[in-house]
């Protein structure tokens, strides 16, 4: 199933090895190709990560006014009134240049890259059991890779057999992960509405992962079937992610600082959660009425836009 991921990963590694092979020895070239694989993959998804982060911050900045509009929608009585509020919400998004980003895209690239590298290394570790080629790597590439060492240890060996040697890298990877997670938790704390159950639970899950992730990484490195090359990939990948996170946080702080109104909404949500002060919810009948009005209002707006279109072009 994961074989398909081997081809782009092995292709990237082969390209970088070919490019730098003239300047360094064979073993160093393969080690550097792993680092450049990290930079290539993370570099591709960095703009997407920024788009997702920027989109999330803008939605937070819009929250106070957007919340007021949503509350007004719950009390709208006519289609025209609802249409006016929907238009107001659309204008708000335009004023902030809000473009929802596909936050799920980066994992769809980084996870296959990791799985592809894992399959490449694992198959080269057990090459005697199958073909002499792996992905886009031919027999000569595989043989050279298998002879590549890190501090005298073949990078196709399992990391659990060389714990003392790799502990500094594992500890560094865990430190990078912890620092990155702490930054994410602080960012989430400053933007989470704690009186909303879903948002509160997501924040709690992030906090739990802050504790579980380092333990899991340590366990996998010392007990799992992970080659040395994967540990090297981890170390550089988490370092890249931490640097990226710090840069993005600086950009967010300078370009999209949180307003006092946003902070006050968060503080009020914490007070409401602690005091168990729940806002009165709409009844089923009211929800149906509001949803019906929204549907009618959208049709009303589309109809008006279609009528105004030819006139605007003339």
Predicted region positions:
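Hydrophobic alpha-helical transmembrane segments
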Residues: 21-51, 103, 158-171
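Membrane-spanning helices that line or support transport/gating and their immediate boundary helices
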Residues: 15, 47, 51-54, 58, ...
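Membrane-interface amphipathic helices and adjacent TM-edge segments
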Residues: 44-114, 179-216
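Cytosolic, positively charged, low-complexity intrinsically disordered regions immediately flanking transmembrane
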Residues: 243-314
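Interfacial loop/helix-cap signal at membrane boundaries in integral membrane proteins
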Residues: 1-32, 137-162
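Hydrophobic alpha-helical transmembrane segments and adjacent short intramembrane/lumenal linkers
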Residues: 115, 119-126, 130-263
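Extended, helix-rich structural scaffolds rather than catalytic motifs
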Residues: 1-7, 230, 244, 269
């Amino acid at each position: 199933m994961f074989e398909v991921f081997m081809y782009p990963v092995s292709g990237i590694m082969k390209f970088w090895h070919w490019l730098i092979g003239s300047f360094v020895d064979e073993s160093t070239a393969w080690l550097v190709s792993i680092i450049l694989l990290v930079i290539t993959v993370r570099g591709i998804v960095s703009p997407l990560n920024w788009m997702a982060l920027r989109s999330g911050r803008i939605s937070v900045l819009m929250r106070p006014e957007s919340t007021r509009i949503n509350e007004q929608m719950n009390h709208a009585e006519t289609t025209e009134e609802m249409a006016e509020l929907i238009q107001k919400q659309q204008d708000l998004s335009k004023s902030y240049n809000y473009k929802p980003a596909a936050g799920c895209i980066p994992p769809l690239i980084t996870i296959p890259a990791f799985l592809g590298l894992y399959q490449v290394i694992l198959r080269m570790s057990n090459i005697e059991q199958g073909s002499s080629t792996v992905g886009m790597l031919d027999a000569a590439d595989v043989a050279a890779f298998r002879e590549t060492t890190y501090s005298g240890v073949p990078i196709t060996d399992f990391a659990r057999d060389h714990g003392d040697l790799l502990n500094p890298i594992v500890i560094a990877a865990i430190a990078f992960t912890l620092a990155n997670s702490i930054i994410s938790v602080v960012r989430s704390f400053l933007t989470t509405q704690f009186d909303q159950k879903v948002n509160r639970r997501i924040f709690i899950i992030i906090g739990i992962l802050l504790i579980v992730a380092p333990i899991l990484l340590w366990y996998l490195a010392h007990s799992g079937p992970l080659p040395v090359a994967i540990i090297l990939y981890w170390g550089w990948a988490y370092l890249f992610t931490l640097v990226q996170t710090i840069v993005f946080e600086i950009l967010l702080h300078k370009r999209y600082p949180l307003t006092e109104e946003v902070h006050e909404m968060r503080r009020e949500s914490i007070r409401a959660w602690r005091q168990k002060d729940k806002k009165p919810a709409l009844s089923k009948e009211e929800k149906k009425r509001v949803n019906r009005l929204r549907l009618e209002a959208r049709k009303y707006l589309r109809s008006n836009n279609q009528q105004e279109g030819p006139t605007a072009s003339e």
